[in-house]
Structure formats: structure tokens, C-alpha cells
Amino acid sequence: MAAQFLMDMGYQILERNWRAYRKEIDIIAIDGKDIVFVEVKTRQGDDYGAPEMAVNRRKKAHIYAVATSYYYEHKIDLDVRFDVISILYHHGKPEINHIVDAFHSIE
């Protein structure tokens, strides 16, 4: 669902569920002159807060480590961006929130 959302927005999907160091990035995509590393969080309700709140400092560090590995392994010459896609289901219907440039490295 998140990958299709990004494709509909004009992103080129490069990878899904790319792994390094026993960690994973959900989606790697190109958006214009940026390579975008996307974390996707889904919740069935908001009892535990918004899905994007689960992207804490530790999760950001994992994403950054995997992104760094991908960046150097593939010799990327693009600007790097970290996005979060939050999918929250209300009565069975998904509400998608795309947070562009959600964080910078491991703030």
C-alpha cells in the first residue's frame, strides 16, 4: 500500500524490505534528485498513539545504518532524505500520512 502510494506520487521504487546488519528499510525510492529511505508504520487504531511515534531514536539509528550501507554499496550520487509513512486504520479504512524529510540522520 505504501509503495503504491509513493508510485502514485511519482516516486521510483528501487527496493522493498532491503536488509543490512540484520536490520531493514521498508522502501528505498527516488524522488527527483533525492534517494529516499522510507519507514512504514501501520496501526489498526490510535490506542497506542500515531504510528509515526514508533520511529524513535533507536529506530532512526537502525534506518540510518542501513541507509548508509545502501548508499555506499550502490555508489549513490543523490541527496539523501528520510521519510515516514504512517498508515492508521479507522473502521477498516486506511488513512495515509506521508511525512517528508521526517528526520535527519539520528537526531
Language-model regions, residue ranges each:
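Residue-level signal for inorganic ion chemistry
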Residues: 6, 63, 82
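Mid-chain, well-packed structural core segment of small domains
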Residues: 47-78
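Domain-level recognition of nuclease-like catalytic cores that cleave nucleotide substrates
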Residues: 73-107
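Feature marks short, surface-exposed loop/turn motifs that line or immediately flank catalytic pockets
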Residues: 44-46, 88
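Short acidic/glycine-enriched loop/turn segments that link adjacent beta-strands
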Residues: 20-23, 93
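Conserved catalytic cores of phosphodiester-cleaving nucleases, focusing on short active-site segments
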Residues: 25-44, 55-57, 63
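Acidic-basic catalytic patches of nuclease active cores, encompassing PD-(D/E)XK
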Residues: 1-16
